[in-house]
Amino acid sequence: GGSRLANLNYYAEDLLNPYQPKQVVIYCGENDVVHTDKPSAKEVLSRFKQFFNTVRTKYPNANISYVSIKYSPSREEYWPIMKKVNLKIKSFLKTKKNTDFIDITKVMNDENGKVRKDIFLEDMLHMKPEGYQLWTKVMYPYLK
């Protein structure tokens, strides 16, 4: 737990070398935002771009899919920067071929647009199985 984009970049070769992926799905960035170094949205984007470029260089035809940062109730104070990071990564991916931005935030909201707390464990950070079932419905169409 607690993985950050810096970890993906550090371990990129170990993570990627054993495979010849047709698709790389990335869910990372939430822990970057809340880490003690408190990076800006621009810095988190920079870290993402570094990993993106590593994947793209090694596997030029692989589809790269990014799963948006979720808005955990326990991290509500960070939602504004998380929203900025999501927008920056989404905008970046729009300029690249063979990419997807998978927005899982909307499916986690109730009918009033508020984050559903009932899909989270007591810590209000990690999800219950119901939360992951919602993600599955959103993500499945993107899987290659």
Describe the function of each predicted region.
Residues G1-Q50, P73-L87:
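Conserved SGNH/GDSL esterase-like catalytic core that processes O-acyl groups on lipids
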